[in-house]
Amino acid sequence: MRVAGKGLIDRNRVLRFTFGGQSFEGFAGDSLASALLANDQRLIGRSFKYHRPRGIVTAGSEEPNALVTLERGFAREPNSRATMQPLYDGLVARPQNAWPSLKFDVLAVNDVLAPFLSAGFYYKTFMWPRKFWEWVYEPAIRQAAGLGALSKRYDHELYEKAYAHCDVLIIGAGPAGLMAALTAGRAGLDVILADEHDQLGGRLLSEMEHIDGMPAAAWVQAAVAELAGFANVRIMANTTVTGAYDQGVFGALERVGLGVEALPEGLPRETFWRIYTKGAILCAGALERQIAFANNDRPGIMAAGAMRSYLNRFGVSPGQRVAIFGNNADAHRTARDFAQAGVEVVAMIDSRAEAQPLGDYPLYTGAVVTGSRGRLALKSIDIRQNDGSVKRIDCDALGVSGGWNPSVHLTCHMNGRPVWDPALASFTPQPGAIPGLVAAGAAAGEMSTQGALAQGQAEALTLAKALGKRVKPSALPVADATPYEITPFWDVGGTGRAWLDFQNDVTVKDIKQAVQENFRSVEHMKRYTTQGMATDQGKNSNVAALAVLADATGRGIPETGTTTFRPPYVPVALAALGAGGHGKGFAPERLLTSDRMSRERGAPMVEAGLWYRPSYFPQEGETHWRQACDREVQMVRNTVGICDVSTLGKIDIQGPDAAAFLDFLYTNSFASLKQGRVRYGLMLREDGHVMDDGTCARLGADHYLMTTTTAAAGQVMRHMDFVHQGLRPDLDVSFTSVTEHWAQFAVAGPEARALLNGILDRKISNKTLPYMGYKAVQLGGIAARLFRISFSGEHAYELAVPARYGESLFQLLLARAEALGGGAYGLEALNVLRIEKGFITHAEIHGRTTAFDIGLARMVSEAKDCIGKTMAARPGLVGPERDQLVGLRPIGEVKQIIPGAHLFAPEAQAVSKNDEGYVTSMCYSPTLGSVIAQAFLRDGRNRHGQQIKMVEHLSGVTTLCEVCAPVFFDPEGGRLRG
């Protein structure tokens, strides 16, 4: 209900919204959660496992219960926290994890079955009959699991990634954060002030405090106005710092479009920031924890500090008759504020015997809440008084405060561990856990406003001095300095179910059961019970759960330890992390210099990594790609063909130790390679498996040009960087990728030399440019590189020119080729040509094959060392038991061979234990007039001439094949060298 005269909302601006199909009204400045409470909507959702009724618990990002699905036109955003969603006119939200309705949820039957669904039930309950797991149990569990549902529609909203640099990043804009920002801003530092809420001020907006004689909210307004006037201060509201990383890098999620339905064109819904800073101050405050008692999860039971936030910031009371239960002095502030606002406070239950009231309300000292009543919302509580008597109190809202936990999460993101502070009964940040990050205010365990202001100023001054700024501290504002008093109290005890993790339905009993079943480690307990594995990551429950675990194991909380803190601090949309990573342009589209002309000729383009390459070049009268492919293959075999091979990786290598570097990378020697010659090379990973193959030309005494496959160009470049920096930093060598510097074209076929001699400034011959040779040439006065290498098995060359001349050269080559009866050929024909010749691609060197497997073991030099050499000789990586490269020809009635199909002995049953290999590549060869294939077959080189059965289980195709050598065309190589 609304409370007159309270809150920072604008009651003159009425906003309409819907929840669960019902229409409601709120005010500007409301959150969705506060507006729902103002409309007496206490039932907001259902829990994950038992589907128990759930209401709002907190007022921040740690909210475990009030998760809703927001709808914006066709867009749907599940698992949105109502506590963090500013209200806007037309907002549409609906509850989730309930069917058919929120009030009547069929799966609430799980709560009746709770004895069978206790901790670790999935390891024990559904074990029999065994085959039911796959067909019955697992599908049923997966169907029931989850909270919100993703939309299956394409997300048309814009997301961005961005980078920012600053002197100091201040995380959180409460009293410590604002004071730190003012101090750093006045000192002239470049400041970023990030806060996850839409309004700055932190807890100051939720308290009835005064700073320097003015209301805290007014002081916040003045501080923010001053900060906004600094050119060196950037204020980022609605921005959650999600992770701390090496070298002063922080991740942050800015929810740009959080408070509007439709964004202006070009404005992103969310932006994920990478912030680089010289220093950071964590002022993220503290999170209130619960006390476990029977049925403490009913709607209407919430954090006492959150109740205070809804009253003082939003002008909302979650009930008409309010009770408070706590173990610390801060809980009394809630009772005081509600009483002063005219809301009936029926009880302040304090577990401490010596507690003193702060106002006019009934106080029960040395008492505890033992249970609650109500089906879909709280109706009453039972308390046990200090004399042992039990009393029932009617109320519709209960605020619970088990103390405050400093927000240590970011300080632990680099494997640091927090430090237990017995005075606070909480974990506090470990100093120096994150280099350059310090904590101030409640995040550092300083719970008073005066202390938070002082720490924020002190840490900012220290950082300013470290960065060379001379600054005099300004007068510190005067604020409340009341010390924080607490007597630890975690669990009331009793026979009823007392809840710790509200979202995942983890109870005190579950923790104790995990201990009984010997899951005593905190990490084991976490995974066995799912404690702290919900979307709030245990922010509300982990410390209380650790206390229960410590008690059950007879240890202290410090000895029990904490689970590992990992980023992100709050859930981050994958669309924000991968901004720009969806749709066709998720990565750079790399186009050939011949792209325009290829498309003009009707060539369908296919993706080859990030490149677009022509698949084939159709001609008039051709109705199927095979017709074009067969024609192009025969064209290359009989006349001449032109193919753009610019996509091959090209790495320029120079330096006195270039040859030694290549010898270390490749299995074979390149120090012995003569200038003007090209050599085929094989590169291994450190585990002995083939990484890549390609050619390397020696352009000068200390100058080489390496080519890689299109698929592995980036991988090879990264590998070379690693080898040079990590393994051989002693070598004086430099290398750089020049893939896009050069346009390179294969000229293949019997007429290849004739074509080139028609365009080169000086003619070539077999003597001046033999097979596997290189020559610097000119055509029309333009310097070019000519390599005599072949991937087709034909007399062939590769001609490279600076990329700016690529399109013109392609046009020239194409015209000359067509005049000789040839033309362009695409990727399909290139694949057929290489299979006919027995050449391999990454279909064969797919990461699981060795030099021995592909028949190139002799290329591993005995005279030198190289990466992977020793590992490649391990038992199991050589020998007849290995799958070895072979060729296949169909010899039965069925002529179909399918890549990926498995090979079996002709009479063997086609099951896994009889598997003898698999097909990697196949094509129809117009040269041979039949289907041919490459495959890996166990001991294949000794089985040429034998028969093998190919079985493709998905399509049900079985083909009898003859095993042969992988080289089908011109095995002597006469056409290459002619």
Predicted stretch roles:
Residues 1-589, 741:
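Residues forming the flavin
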Residues 34-44, 656-673, 754, 758-762:
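A short, contiguous, amphipathic alpha-helix enriched in charged residues
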